From Swiss-Prot:
Functional summary from the UniProt entry: Specifically methylates the pseudouridine at position 1915 (m3Psi1915) in 23S rRNA.
Subcellular location: Cytoplasm
Gene Ontology cellular-component terms listed: cytoplasm
Keywords assigned: Cytoplasm, Methyltransferase, rRNA processing, S-adenosyl-L-methionine, Transferase
Protein name as it appears in the record: Ribosomal RNA large subunit methyltransferase H
An example molecular function term from Gene Ontology annotations: rRNA (pseudouridine-N3-)-methyltransferase activity
Gene3D superfamilies for this protein: 3.40.1280.10
Chain segments annotated as coiled-coil in the UniProt record: none
InterPro entries in alphabetical order: Alpha/beta_knot_MTases (IPR029028), RlmH-like (IPR003742), tRNA_m1G_MTases_N (IPR029026)
EC identifiers of the protein: 2.1.1.177
HAMAP family referenced in this protein's UniProt entry, alphabetically: 23SrRNA_methyltr_H
Class in the EC hierarchy, top level: transferase
Length: 155
């Protein structure tokens, strides 16, 4: 199993980068005993101005073949943290790769979005993609702690 966050744009050094690194490091340490691999970050950038279609092509190349495709989109399902953890556990138990895709300023091209196994939303509001990365990294770590029975998550 591989876990990938494929995102449009480059993350500069700053508080967001530190938070993402911290949560993904925590996940890597806690997830090892649960059979969860470290998360890799694949950043893509369309420098030719091709828009969502060009971004989708770059994102598709970053996604492992056959991976469960999870897109972050304001039209997606709003899962609880335990529901998200259960999805991750299911992919782990199937030994299936999973790719979380975060689009750019204009979102994710419908051609890629419509082929997703799951679309999730962090609410009906639109979030800056750098904050979505932080929120996703935290939820991946939180899912790991839920699966481990760690008290980090409280109901």
């Amino acid at each position: 199993m591989r876990m990938v966050i494929a995102a449009v744009g480059r993350l500069r050094q700053g508080p967001e980068a530190k938070l993402i690194a911290d949560y993904l490091d925590r996940h890597a340490k806690a997830g090892r005993a649960l059979g969860l691999p470290p998360v890799t970050l694949a950043e893509v950038e369309d420098k030719r101005g091709g828009g969502m279609v060009a971004e989708a092509a770059l994102l598709a190349r970053a996604i492992p073949q056959g991976a469960a495709l999870v897109v972050l989109d304001e039209r997606g399902q709003m899962l609880s943290s335990p529901e998200f953890a259960a999805r991750i556990a299911g992919w782990r138990d199937q030994a299936r790769d999973v790719a979380f895709v975060i689009g750019g300023a204009d979102g994710i091209d419908p051609g890629l979005r419509d082929g997703a196994d799951l679309a999730i939303s962090f609410g009906r509001m639109v979030w800056p993609h750098m904050l979505v990365r932080v929120m996703l990294a935290e939820q991946i770590y939180r899912a790991t702690t839920i699966l481990a029975g760690n008290p980090y998550h409280r109901e």
